[in-house]
Amino acid sequence: MLFDTHLHTKFSADSKMSIEDAILSAKQQNIGLVLTEHLDYDFPGDDIYEFNPQQYFQEYSSYQSKTLYLGVEVGMQEHTLIQSKKFVESAPFDQVICSLHLLDGKDLFYESCYTENKHTVYLNYLNTMIKLIKQHDFANILGHVDYICRYAPYAKKDICYEEFHDT
């Protein structure tokens, strides 16, 4: 069975999906789910990417099965590493994705991250990701490596191995 292993519900600031709707959609597609609510301490802006893991498990544990698992997506930042690790250790998560959503403390969604040329910005992104995933040794999965490509203002947004394999 295939699984969608990166899915947010109402416990994430960027989703309003109910677990019931997620399960119904998964059944229609004949796939399993791993819910991965956002945990991104000290995220800039108005949205709070934090949730109560005890409440999460209290509400959702009865749905756990061979086709539904409960996880978390941790936003990686060096200064929140210890806090994030304690959070992950506070509950029996089935899966832990660690992702890079910020670069030098700035949200990759905004053009203010892209003041340098593409190679410089992407190299900083990749080097930061490598450094942080090594520190976040509690991760099972490194999330969306190409996240920067969604929002970068460059004509050619893709990360190409040929451009970075020597650096």
Question: Which residue stretches match the model-derived regions?
Answer:
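An N-terminally biased module of ancient metal coordination in phosphate/nucleic-acid-related enzymes
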Residues: M1-E78, C149-E162, D166
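Active-site gating/metal-coordination segments in enzymes
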Residues: F11, S61-Y69, E73-T120
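Domain-core and long-helix interface of multi-subunit machines
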Residues: F11-A13, I97-T167
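Short amphipathic alpha-helices and their capping/turn segments at secondary-structure boundaries
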Residues: I19-Q28, H79-F93, Y125-A139, F164-T167
